[in-house]
Amino acid sequence: MAAAAAAVAGAGRGGGGGAEPRQERSRARGWAGAERSEGRRMEPGEELEEEDSPGGREDGFTAEHLAAEAMAADMDPWLVFDARMTPATELDAWLAKYPPSQVTRYGDPGSPNSEPVGWIAAYGQGYIPNSGDVQGLQAAWEALQTSGRPVTPGTLRQLAITHQVLSGKWLIHLAPGFKLDHAWAGIARAVVEGRLQVAKVSPRAKEGGRQVICVYTDDFTDRLGVLEADAAIRAAGVKCLLTYKPDVYTYLGIYRANRWHLCPTLYESRFQLGGSARGSRVLDRANNVELT
């Protein structure tokens, strides 16, 4: 299984997690879900359309500012549970040690981390870095913008397919507290048990605000795979609104309120109590069509 994750290699030492060595991190994040310094990432906002920046601020910032914040988070050490190296029996202790509502972005003597942490991540035994041609994608994007040709969802989809930058993620926004920690624990267990591939959660920002959990899939064009991941997230106990964003938008710095008036998220999922056996209703946002 080729994992679609923003995860760093080498985690799992020392009891299943810890701050990652920079050289290990740069070697492992070579694929499309790996929100790297080459890619633009995380736009915070009140609308549930984008990833929240690990910096935690929510409105009034340009895409360039948000990309810079996200890049800084990506360069800082991560806390990672790597099921390829660490027994699953150690997961509960790791989760108890690093609850995302308590891990702070820049470190604090009273928090589990005294040094900055960019992300907290978990990935399963099938994690295989596979980035696609991100540099080629970004070069083609620059050429498209200078050509004056229209920028449309179809254009971006074709760029992603051409350069094999196909990963995407379900986004879950929650305020710091029990619900966030509970949701993250359920998702991390699903990753380690093989029901999901890779996931990460932002640490708590100094300013407060919502944190974001990102759950990755290999291929945003594989609708069945995207829906299966949604079902696994619901089975893990998550009941809030989810939105799904292809990583091609992330790498190209396309956020909500962008100059092309594009919606960066393809799908939204709403929990359905006592309704569908799968536990949610998923909407294709571009076409306003229910998929489940």
From Swiss-Prot:
It comes from the Eukaryota. InterPro entries: Bles03, TIF_eIF4e-like. Residues 35-44 have a biased composition (Basic and acidic residues). Residues 1-10 have a biased composition (Low complexity). Residues 1-60 are annotated as: Disordered. PANTHER family: UPF0696 PROTEIN C11ORF68 (PTHR31977:SF1). Belongs to the UPF0696 family. This is UPF0696 protein C11orf68 homolog. The lineage of its organism: Eukaryota, Metazoa, Chordata, Craniata, Vertebrata.
